[in-house]
């Protein structure tokens, strides 16, 4: 698959989608994107900057949602232009898609909406690549149906059918908890779509703090190492210079100062994993 001008797949180094959970300010976006661009370039990692102009799914109605679509897209467009980095953001309704598609390079679908057929069809017909998140309630093999919906919609619109990624972000495990079944990364490869592992939302504790979600950010390195050892096309991580002060998802955000060391480890592991190939592909023979 071609994504933002580069090839992605299990024969390539993982690409990185990263940034603050939500657009807090123009300066924060520029600072984080600039730092991530510098360290990913040094490590030979293709980088896509991520941030949300609106967080439609919040634990409390009083939680910060973001600057809104108009202001948020203005800031994201400035990051894209000034730093020359591709941009990913999530859309929440069909009505948002046309305007957002004019600004960003990649769209993302919220996990809770992966079964919404009309919504999936609409993003698939946007003309942009789409990172489709697997719902916390969905079995990994059921992502084939989601990807097939997107491909069918793209074909109807005369658009490329290979513009979709399948993203794992954990599975519900009782109340206020998620677990990551690493088998899902291998199973979702059967969709034929590049698989992305969301290492930060996978350590979220949804609603675990009452009016906000908790998280175990110390588990991000653990799960991201495991995912890279399994083999993924891409990684997704939210990061912030001061996670305790982040306005959204701070408990599961990677401290920005630790991103370089974490990525160095993951690159070394990725190189070994992909150099040696995937023996499991031969086990069914």
UniProtKB/Swiss-Prot annotation:
SUPFAM superfamilies: Aldolase. Transmembrane segments: none annotated. GO terms for biological process: keto-3-deoxy-D-manno-octulosonic acid biosynthetic process. It is an enzyme of class 2 (transferase). Coiled coil: none annotated. The keyword Transferase applies. GO terms for cellular component: cytoplasm. GO terms for molecular function: 3-deoxy-8-phosphooctulonate synthase activity. Keywords: Cytoplasm, Lipopolysaccharide biosynthesis, Transferase. Pathway: Carbohydrate biosynthesis; 3-deoxy-D-manno-octulosonate biosynthesis; 3-deoxy-D-manno-octulosonate from D-ribulose 5-phosphate: step 2/3; Bacterial outer membrane biogenesis; lipopolysaccharide biosynthesis. It holds the Pfam family DAHP_synth_1. It catalyses: D-arabinose 5-phosphate + phosphoenolpyruvate + H2O = 3-deoxy-alpha-D-manno-2-octulosonate-8-phosphate + phosphate. It is found in: Cytoplasm. Its EC number is 2.5.1.55. Belongs to the KdsA family. This is 2-dehydro-3-deoxyphosphooctonate aldolase.
């Amino acid at each position: 698959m071609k994504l933002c001008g580069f090839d992605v797949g299990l024969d390539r180094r993982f690409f990185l989608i990263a940034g603050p959970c939500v657009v807090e300010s123009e300066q924060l976006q520029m600072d984080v994107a600039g730092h991530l661009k510098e360290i990913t370039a040094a490590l030979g990692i293709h980088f896509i900057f991520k941030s949300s102009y609106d967080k439609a799914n919040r634990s409390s109605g009083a939680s910060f949602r973001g600057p809104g679509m108009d202001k948020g897209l203005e800031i994201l467009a400035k990051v894209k232009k000034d730093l020359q980095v591709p941009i990913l953001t999530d859309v929440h309704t069909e009505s948002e898609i046309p305007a957002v598609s004019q600004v960003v390079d990649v769209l993302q679908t919220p996990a809770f909406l992966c079964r919404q057929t009309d919504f999936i069809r609409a993003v698939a017909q946007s003309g942009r690549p789409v990172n489709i998140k697997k719902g916390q309630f969905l079995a990994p093999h059921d992502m084939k149906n989601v990807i097939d919906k997107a491909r069918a919609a793209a074909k109807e619109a005369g658009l490329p059918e290979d513009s979709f990624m399948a993203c794992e972000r954990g599975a519900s495990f009782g109340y206020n908890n998620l677990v990551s079944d690493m088998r899902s990364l291998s199973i979702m490869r059967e969709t034929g779509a590049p698989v992305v592992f969301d290492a930060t939302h996978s350590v979220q504790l949804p609603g675990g703090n009452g009016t906000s979600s908790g998280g175990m950010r110390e588990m991000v390195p653990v799960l991201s190492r495991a995912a890279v050892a399994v083999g993924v096309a891409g990684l997704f991580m939210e990061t912030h210079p001061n996670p305790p002060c982040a306005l959204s998802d701070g408990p599961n955000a990677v401290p920005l100062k630790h991103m370089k060391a974490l990525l160095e480890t993951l690159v070394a592991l990725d190189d070994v994993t992909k150099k040696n190939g995937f023996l499991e592909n031969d086990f069914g023979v």
